[in-house]
Amino acid sequence: MIVRSLHDIEATDHFVDWGNSTSHRLLTDKDGMGFSICHTIVRANTVSLLQYRNHLEACFCIGGEGEVEDMDGNVFPIRRGDMYVLDKHDKHLLRGGPDKDMILVSIFNPPLTGTERHKLDDPAGSTY
């Protein structure tokens, strides 16, 4: 059995602050479950161009608000209780809400190692 808290993760290299967001990597590749679970806080008034070339991601919003935009310009508001899935390694814009952070539980397959970090200075977007 594996039991962890957000507090436990904050003292490790599995707590990642990449500027526009923080991510607690609660379950990672070394745990051997075949997927990873992250608690992610997307900061209000931020925009990140992202793409997961090596992972599929499903996100469930547990608090706040924000939006995700695909590369065709379709914008999807995300609020508590909403889910979005990047099932085709979709490049996307992730935005925190205008007044609120967006809080997500993210599932990655295959799992993250836990120390991946976005690099937002690349105009083509951050990938891993």
Swiss-Prot record:
NCBIfam families: PRK13290.1. Belongs to the ectoine synthase family. Pathway: Amine and polyamine biosynthesis; ectoine biosynthesis; L-ectoine from L-aspartate 4-semialdehyde: step 3/3. This is L-ectoine synthase. Catalyzes the circularization of gamma-N-acetyl-alpha,gamma-diaminobutyric acid (ADABA) to ectoine (1,4,5,6-tetrahydro-2-methyl-4-pyrimidine carboxylic acid), which is an excellent osmoprotectant. The keyword Lyase applies. It catalyses: (2S)-4-acetamido-2-aminobutanoate = L-ectoine + H2O. PANTHER family: L-ECTOINE SYNTHASE, PTHR39289. It comes from Bradyrhizobium diazoefficiens (strain JCM 10833 / BCRC 13528 / IAM 13628 / NBRC 14792 / USDA 110). InterPro entries: Ectoine_synth, RmlC-like_jellyroll, RmlC_Cupin_sf. Keywords: Lyase. The keyword Lyase applies. Its EC number is 4.2.1.108. One of its GO terms (molecular function) is ectoine synthase activity. The gene is ectC. Coiled coil: none annotated. One of its GO terms (biological process) is ectoine biosynthetic process.
